[in-house]
Amino acid sequence: MRVAVTGGTGFIGRYLLRELLGQGYEVNAWFRHEESRTGILEHPKLHWVKGCLEDAGSIPLLLENCDAVVHNALWRPGNTFRGTEGDLAKYTQINLGGSLSLMEIAAKRQVDRFVYVSTCAVHEKIMDDRPLDETHPLWPFSHYGAHKAAVEKFVHSFAFGHQFPVCAIRPSGVYGVSHRISASKYYDLIGAIARGEDVECKRGGKEVHAADVARGITYLIAAPRDAILGEAFNCYDRYVSEIEVARIARDLSGSRSNITGVEKSPKHEIDTTKLRRLGMNFGGEEQLRKTVKDLFEAVVNPSATRSIQ
């Protein structure tokens, strides 16, 4: 089976490439420029296709001989997902318009599976009288979340109206060792602990490891058609408080850092029953501890060579 991947050179995308190739899939992957592929090892089943959301002409090449598509790409002018959308008309034209072009061409080619990587930011205004599951209303605060919610509506129309086997996965906040190590979530906090500095921990968030997102996507590729048709799937592991990360790092390092702050907890937990029913499980505390250990080692030995693939 051959899978077309957009956004394969990014943070989640690199974990996805490794997971797909590790499971024996052939992969066609978009890349924007040569520098974006830095650190990704060559693989006989990995086929690069130059292209991007702005270049509709590259879509047929990406989809050539493919049985499935994972759409993970996002065009953004800033370094963060929210608040750096820039010109909203351009942002929407590229991301929404490009996503629809990709979906439409894939549907015309009768691709067997299309997985859209959405986000849990589609529901940021949360109601207290119901579970935070996939039936919860989509009320985003950001334009980023709004465009993801808009694409999800076309997931419904393509699936329910045209019987195209498309679905969406909604990762929460995502952590893990990034190919740009210093950009990894918790890197600065762990670095401060490694240096023996005192830290004050104030934040926490709903998190899932990038490797778990990648595995979740493969479950959606392999699931029966009727189980995914037009559906969205929450992808979330656990709430991670900064003070928990700091304490793990201190235990690993033997640091004398003084850690202050309180253990944060979520007001609403995200329900992941649907994805778990397909066989998915998450890395939990063990995955978190391994990631903190890997980041700590990167801080103390920054010259070590690492590759996501």
Regions found by a protein language model. Name each.
Residues H147:
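Active-site helix of classical SDR
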Residues V3-Q23:
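N-terminal Rossmann NAD(P)H-binding glycine-rich loop of SDR-like oxidoreductase domains
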Residues H156-G205:
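NAD(P)-dependent short-chain dehydrogenase/reductase
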Residues G204, A214-Y219, A223-P266, R306-S307:
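Mid/C-terminal beta-alpha module of Rossmann-like enzyme folds, strongest
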Residues H71, G97-H143:
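Conserved Rossmann-fold NAD(P)-dependent oxidoreductase catalytic core, especially the SDR/UDP-sugar
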Residues K50-I94:
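NAD(P)H-binding glycine-rich loop region in Rossmannoid oxidoreductase-like domains
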Residues W30-E35, C52-L53:
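N-terminal Rossmann-fold cofactor-binding loop
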Residues E285-Q309:
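Amphipathic terminal alpha-helices
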